[in-house]
């Protein structure tokens, strides 16, 4: 409606592709090659932002030389996208000056998912599309508070605020704040955890709001691990993983709890309880507090705000955010980093250059590698998954919503 140009790159012709100015129907697993091919065109035609590159990046010469291999013809061969469309997409993205990249789990849930995202960062850095309105590399998270969960340290490498567990200074700070000796080693990722159980490196699995019996790859392998481990589940519904649980803690849904949600633009917003908790359901934080007390770590919180205020003391990016400040801002929330209570928050990151030592972004040479699931000339067919608008992941929640289930009651296969 506003005349903005849209480029869609997706193996599946999603509804958004119908209104896109350019639709790049790439082969699954070729995102890195597409990014490199676009950079090849951008450099060849002098469309890069030379001033931004000079001030705010390192590694440009290596990258410039590296992507020479990814000519439009070579990129077409790898991705299946006509070279004319690749060139047009590169010109459109680089010449607009306020170009915004949005990506979702379609490029992250691969063996090369990290490279996929870094290749998009290369595009943004080389065209100066960082640190200004209408630009950036923006993840569309899987659901409303994935950002908030990551902010709080629900990652195998991080404490709250993305402070690294293996940083001695960070470890010392949290040990002092929490009064306990902490493990300096990185934890297991989701895909590492199942093999670790089978190798007797993990004995207990505490699952909150997940359904790995269905969502994790190699179902038989996962079920074997779940049968072997002591499994604790904390969720609002029973699901396929429940049959492996030794203990189940009934939790509360969003409308039954107080607290904050943080969205993909780092906006911390208040959530207020509007429904009474039923039966034996309890807030997640209350259940965890009871467990901590029972295993010998005494702690007491009266409200979730108490926990938030403790978090502020150890997390610089949240230090200036309070419940009162969120509400005072017309309930529009506050965007971190917000280091002090008189700080307004940060609507746009990287305004003065990337948030990295020296204010420069690192350009990476990323080689496209064929997917291990690639087909062969005899059977040139690829099976891939696609999001259903009406359902979320394993349908633990959406399958219990009558209107949603009525609209999309079954799975289907599309061929093209």
Predicted segments — roles?
Residues 1-145, 152, 165-345, 383, ...:
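Cofactor-pocket helix-loop regions in the catalytic cores of large enzyme subunits
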Residues 161:
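Glycine-rich active-site loops that engage anionic ligands at enzyme catalytic sites
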Residues 329-415:
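Long, compositionally biased stretches
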């Amino acid at each position: 409606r506003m005349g903005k140009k849209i480029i869609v790159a997706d193996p599946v012709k999603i509804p958004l592709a119908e209104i896109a100015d350019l639709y790049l129907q790439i082969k699954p697993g070729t995102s890195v090659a597409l990014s490199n091919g676009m950079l090849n065109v951008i450099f060849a035609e002098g469309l890069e932002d030379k001033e931004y590159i000079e001030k705010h990046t390192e590694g440009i010469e290596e990258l410039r030389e590296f992507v020479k291999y990814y000519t439009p013809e070579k990129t077409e061969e790898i991705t299946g996208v006509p070279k004319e469309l690749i060139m047009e997409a590169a010109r459109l993205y680089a010449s607009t000056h306020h170009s915004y990249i949005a990506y979702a789990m379609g490029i992250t849930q691969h063996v090369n998912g990290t490279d996929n995202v870094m290749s998009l960062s290369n595009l943004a850095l080389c065209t100066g599309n960082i640190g200004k309105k209408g630009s950036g590399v923006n993840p569309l998270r899987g659901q409303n508070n994935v950002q908030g969960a990551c902010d709080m340290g629900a990652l195998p490498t991080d404490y709250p605020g993305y402070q690294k567990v293996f940083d001695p200074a960070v470890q010392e700070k949290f040990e002092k704040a929490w009064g306990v000796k902490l493990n300096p080693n990185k934890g297991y990722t989701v895909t590492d955890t199942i093999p670790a159980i089978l190798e007797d490196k993990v004995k207990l699995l505490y699952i909150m709001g997940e359904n790995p019996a269905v969502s994790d790859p190699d179902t038989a392998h996962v079920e074997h691990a779940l049968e072997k481990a002591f499994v604790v589940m904390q969720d609002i519904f029973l699901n396929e993983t429940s049959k492996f649980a030794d203990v189940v803690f009934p939790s509360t849904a969003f409308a039954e709890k107080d607290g904050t949600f943080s969205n993909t633009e780092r906006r911390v917003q208040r959530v207020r309880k509007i429904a009474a908790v039923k039966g034996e359901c309890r807030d997640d934080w209350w259940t965890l507090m009871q467990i901590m007390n029972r295993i010998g770590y005494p702690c007491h919180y009266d409200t979730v705000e108490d926990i938030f205020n403790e978090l502020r003391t150890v997390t610089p990016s949240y230090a200036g955010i309070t419940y009162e400040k969120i509400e005072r801002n017309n309930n529009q929330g506050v965007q971190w980093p917000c280091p002090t209570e008189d700080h307004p928050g940060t609507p746009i990151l990287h305004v003065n250059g990337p948030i990295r030592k020296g204010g420069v972004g690192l350009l990476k040479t990323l080689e496209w590698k064929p997917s291990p699931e690639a087909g062969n000339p005899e059977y040139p067919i690829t099976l891939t998954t696609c999001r259903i608008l009406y359902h979320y992941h394993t349908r633990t929640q959406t399958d219990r919503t009558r209107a949603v289930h009525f609209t999309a009651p079954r799975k289907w296969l599309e061929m093209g």
